Amino acid sequence: MQLSSLAAALGLPARADLAGVEITGVTHNSSWVEPGALFVALRGANTDGHTYLPQALQRGAVAVMGEGLPDGVACPVPYLTVPHGREALADAAAELAGHPSRGMGVVGVTGTDGKTTTAWMTRHLLRAVGVPTGFLSTVGYELPDGELRQFPAHFTTPEAPQVQQFLAELRAAGAQAVVLE
């Protein structure tokens, strides 16, 4: 996807330096950057993702997105300034994945106790009435045909790019609904 198209989809103003830049993926983790990636520098309680900008660029990031470059930090690739980095990460991931949840029924289960039971029961009920349903939990995901897949070991809770990737896989496997724990 062209960076200019992604920026437009995110509601960002058009800029000449975005033309011709091809984005092949998005991540907030500099060690997961692959050539062609958009690196999203998130600010956290203990660290600022901009600290990892050199590593992301070395690994092949072709653009960076964040809530603003810190003073004294240079960025030799296009930098997209957004008001909310984590929200922009989610929106960019959905856009790059083709918004896989559109057209699917999506059930989210949150809370302290009973999430897994509630999510599995919901999945079972949807399948019982003939709705091909995928399932996404904190340990893995299940395709509509019942095939279980575990997340790679480095995931504890999948972030937006991984969730969108899994949703795209579920949709490609025929899911008409998904239950997210």
Q: Which residues does each predicted region cover?
A:
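N-terminal leader/targeting and accessory segments in enzymes
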Residues: 1-91, 95
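Phosphate-binding loop of NTP-binding sites
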Residues: 88-180
